[in-house]
Amino acid sequence: MSHTSLLKAARPAWRASAAISKAATRPFSVCSQLRAAAPILLEDKEKGFGFIRHNNRPPKPRSVGVTEIRGPYYSAMGKRYLQDVLETMGHHVDGLKFAGGSFSLFPEDKLKELINLAHEYNVYVSTGGWMEHVLLQSDPVWAVDQYLKKCKQLGFDVIEISSGFLSIPQDDWLRIVDKVHAEGLIAKPECGIQFGAGGDTEASELSSLGTSDPSKIIHMGKRFIDAGVERIMIESEGITENVQSWRTDVIQQILRELPQEKVMFEAADPKVFNWYIREFGTDVNLFVDHSQIVQLSCLREGIWGQSDTFGSVVNYRP
């Protein structure tokens, strides 16, 4: 069986299911043992800094203004490290992503500790784009089944489905989405214009590979939404990362055609997420490194910023 096709060529074209699974329609993160969250000082009008002007943000689980953070990848992260992040900034964190296959390097009990801790703070937990590696196994259908079952048993909420390194038929991509939803998990496709994105490839090599037409993202995005996908991740390579000049035209084109709440942008640099907040406001969904959560949250709240955003990021929520 070809590594780039899950099903035989004779299989009929994919069609959207008549009934979207419950997994595809529930909030990203559901936990019955949430910690009681103390109000942050900025929202405490009686004893804190609530008298300072700031932007009103929706409570979790949010569908707009979502912030997903990268967990262990550039640095190791255990329970104590994550506890520090969530005890201080958990109010601002919506999702935790284990980049690539980083989660496979953990002892199972330690990985579950991180996942369970995230859930206590109403933070959903997502895999990285390891599905690409799973599809390269000699029997990809069996491997995908085993992968999803194990991820569910570990406590993951969201399965990222990337294809930055693979050429895969669009219908097969949608079949994987259906399979993820059928397992009671949430599919989060990752799309981009740069082939070879999502790894540690040098910028010069990425440039030589060329880019795809942005209309491909838009076409697939619409099909994913029809399949019940709640949110699509947009890869930064080729758009705002490893490029001589940002492809803001691609971003604008995506948001002209796809609902903003259905899209999340990877923002790998403070200048990038500063631009997203400036251009699209506090409700834009962003994926950043966990080390950047404070800086991004200051921007969303409208209490700090760079020269072009300081004191100018506002919303109106009567």
PLM feature spans:
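Acidic (Asp/Glu)-rich catalytic clusters
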Residues: 83-90, 109-122, 145-154, 176-184, ...
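Hydrophobic faces of well-ordered beta-strands that scaffold small-molecule active sites
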Residues: 64-71, 94-98, 125-129, 159-161, ...
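Active-site-adjacent beta->alpha loops and helix N-cap segments on the catalytic face
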Residues: 104-115, 136-145, 165-185, 195-199, ...
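Active-site mouth loops of central-metabolism enzymes
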Residues: 63-80, 99-103, 126-143, 166, ...
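N-terminal mitochondrial targeting presequence
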Residues: 1-40
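Conserved anion-binding
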Residues: 158-239
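C-terminal alpha-helical cap/extension of soluble enzyme domains
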Residues: 41-58, 255-318
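Conserved N-terminal beta1-alpha1 strand-loop-helix module at the mouth
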Residues: 37-113
